[in-house]
Swiss-Prot record:
Zinc finger (RING-type): 445-480
Species: Xenopus tropicalis (Western clawed frog)
Taxon lineage: Eukaryota, Metazoa, Chordata, Craniata, Vertebrata
GO terms classed as biological process: apoptotic process; negative regulation of apoptotic process; negative regulation of proteolysis; nucleotide-binding oligomerization domain containing 2 signaling pathway; positive regulation of canonical NF-kappaB signal transduction; positive regulation of protein linear polyubiquitination; Wnt signaling pathway
Major location (coarse): cytoplasm
Catalytic activities: S-ubiquitinyl-[E2 ubiquitin-conjugating enzyme]-L-cysteine + [acceptor protein]-L-lysine = [E2 ubiquitin-conjugating enzyme]-L-cysteine + N(6)-ubiquitinyl-[acceptor protein]-L-lysine
Protein name (Swiss-Prot/TrEMBL): E3 ubiquitin-protein ligase XIAP
PROSITE patterns associated with the record: BIR_REPEAT_1 (PS01282), BIR_REPEAT_2 (PS50143), ZF_RING_2 (PS50089)
Protein purpose: Multi-functional protein which regulates not only caspases and apoptosis, but also acts as an E3 ubiquitin-protein ligase mediating ubiquitination and subsequent proteasomal degradation of its target proteins. Acts as a direct caspase inhibitor. E3 ubiquitin-protein ligase that acts as an important regulator of innate immunity by mediating 'Lys-63'-linked polyubiquitination of ripk2 downstream of NOD1 and NOD2, thereby transforming ripk2 into a scaffolding protein for downstream effectors, ultimately leading to activation of the NF-kappa-B and MAP kinases signaling.
Record text about domains: The BIR and RING-type domains are dispensable for anti-apoptotic function.
Enzyme category, top tier: transferase
Subunit structure: Monomer, and homodimer.
The encoding gene: xiap
Residues bound to Zn(2+): 303, 306, 323, 330
BIR repeat copies, ranges: 40-105, 172-237, 271-334
């Protein structure tokens, strides 16, 4: 099997057409004074708190405050927006009024502290020639320096995925109608690995990165070859690029982050209407803003996007914070509040929402029945004690009224519980920033020291490697136990 190299691509500077812009012409250059999110956020010092969209959400969406009413301006496309209404989201509004804005188009995959640049984009390892570099202006050279030092992110790379029409695994599978019979790999395996058939010999292409592969051999594995030749592919790295797996590959119904749990509750007013008979101490409007709607069972609420359920609310609870503690991966939450907010909320764990009383936990099944569960068997094979398993299952039932349905979520909560137990209460107070740094270091792969840990080795149960490194390890780097199986988990 051989990779097909992509060609050199030079991206042109974007043009932005916004239906709701300030009068008159504007400079196409970005406002470099506000390309850092912290600077944009500082501009909202006098922003009225009564407005329906929060300052952090606006700053994260690329806006800074103009000082006039609720009017904000994008540092990148220079679009101005005002007249914010309940139910508006900063990112959604930005995309609607300025669909060509480079910053907002790259929002899902890139950092927010960026500026627009017009630099050549290299694909699959191609380098600039000396002639290309000699012709570049001083501003382009400065932009390249900023990119290399990590201060900004190049927004000129094309939006992922490259082939939106092939996001569905079923759609990719349909392209293999004339797949050559001599190929040793099945269409199902290739489609599952993000590849679709180009119609040329045995050549396939990734819907996300656009990488091409051909000349397959009997010993080849679709996922392995995809990772080997295109290791930077966002789909291979496990990022949410909109892939829609077939029902057989959804791992017990686990939903991708780009899909809504309840599309009918996408609108703020629709969520607010569900609280018509609400009599509990927490403000229903605040709950609706945080993405929750009432499910009609006491004070139980559910997020329209991630499907997370929270109950037992008190008057002092912050719905946004509780959302971040319990369901940090919710894309609506990330878009609205930002990763910094979520990280700080996570430091205030326990993640699980407060119950009304200590004895409010539903009874667990007896040990004999509990041990029959495949989830419990897998967890015990990873080295988790039965007492910890019972405790985490009880907390899950207390919080949601339901038990675990997929091993990834179960193992993730078990790991979080283990970290909490191992904490030393006598440690000296550490600043939030230091705790955050330590938390990030704990989640880094101990092999490459770059990507995040995501694979549990079985049977030893050690969680120390990312998906890329774990794929090439036959023995656990901690205890040298031979790896019989690898289980991917999703860390909160």
């Amino acid at each position: 099997m051989e990779p097909q190299l992509a060609e050199f691509v030079l991206k042109e500077e974007m043009t932005c057409q916004c239906p709701k812009m300030s009068d008159g012409a504007y400079d196409m250059d970005v406002d470099q004074n506000y390309f850092e999110e912290e600077v944009r956020l500082a501009s909202f010092a006098n922003f009225p708190s009564s407005y329906p969209v929060s300052a952090p959400a606006l700053a994260r969406a690329g806006f800074y405050y103009t000082g006039d009413g609720d009017r904000v301006k994008c540092f990148s496309c220079l679009a101005m927006v005002e007249g914010w209404q309940h139910g508006d989201t900063a990112i959604g509004k930005h995309r609607k009024i300025s669909p060509n804005c480079k910053f907002i188009n790259g929002f899902n995959n890139l950092r927010s502290d960026c500026i627009l640049t017009q630099v050549p984009v290299m694909q699959n390892g191609f380098q600039n020639s000396a002639e290309d570099l000699a012709e570049r202006s001083s501003s382009e050279i400065m932009a390249d320096y900023l990119l290399r030092t990590g201060r900004v992110v190049d927004m000129s790379t094309p939006k992922y995925p490259r082939h939106m029409e092939m996001c569905s695994e079923e759609a990719r599978l349909q392209t293999f109608q004339n797949w050559p019979a001599y190929s040793p790999l099945t269409p199902k395996e290739l489609a599952n690995a993000g590849l679709f058939y180009t119609g040329i010999n045995d050549q396939v292409k990734c819907f996300c990165c656009g990488g091409k592969l051909m000349n397959w051999e009997p010993s080849d594995k679709a996922w392995t070859e995809h990772k080997k030749h295109f290791p930077e592919c966002y789909f291979v790295l496990g990022r949410d690029v909109g892939n829609v797996a077939t029902e057989a590959n959804t791992h017990g119904g686990r939903r991708r982050g780009s899909e809504l749990a309840c599309p009918a509750m996408n609108d703020y007013n629709a969520r607010l209407e569900t609280f018509s008979s609400w009599s509990f101490p927490i403000d229903k409007e605040t709950l609706a803003k945080a993405g929750f709607y009432s499910i009609g069972d006491g004070d139980a609420t559910k997020c329209f996007h991630c499907g997370g359920v929270l109950n037992c609310w008190s008057a002092t609870d912050d719905p946004w914070e509780e959302h971040a503690k319990a369901y940090p991966g919710c894309k609506f939450l990330i878009d609205e509040k930002g990763q910094h907010f979520i990280n700080h909320a996570q430091l205030k764990r326990p993640i699980l929402h407060k119950a009304n009383s200590a004895d409010a936990s539903p009874a667990l099944p007896k040990d004999s029945n509990l041990l029959k569960s495949p989830l419990v068997t897998d967890a015990q094979q990873m080295g988790f004690p039965l007492e910890e398993i019972k405790k985490v299952m009880g907390q899950k039932l207390k919080t949601t009224g339901k038990n675990y349905t997929c091993v990834e979520e179960f193992v993730s909560d078990l790991c979080a519980q283990k970290e909490t137990v191992l904490e030393k209460p006598k440690e000296i107070e550490i600043s939030l920033e230091e705790k955050l740094r330590q938390l990030e270091e704990e989640k880094i792969c101990k092999v490459c020291m770059d990507r995040r840990i995501s694979i549990v080795f079985i049977p030893c149960g050690h969680l120390v490697a990312c998906a890329v490194c774990a794929d090439v390890l036959d023995k656990c780097p901690i205890c040298c136990t031979i790896v019989e199986r690898r289980q991917k988990i999703f860390m909160s």
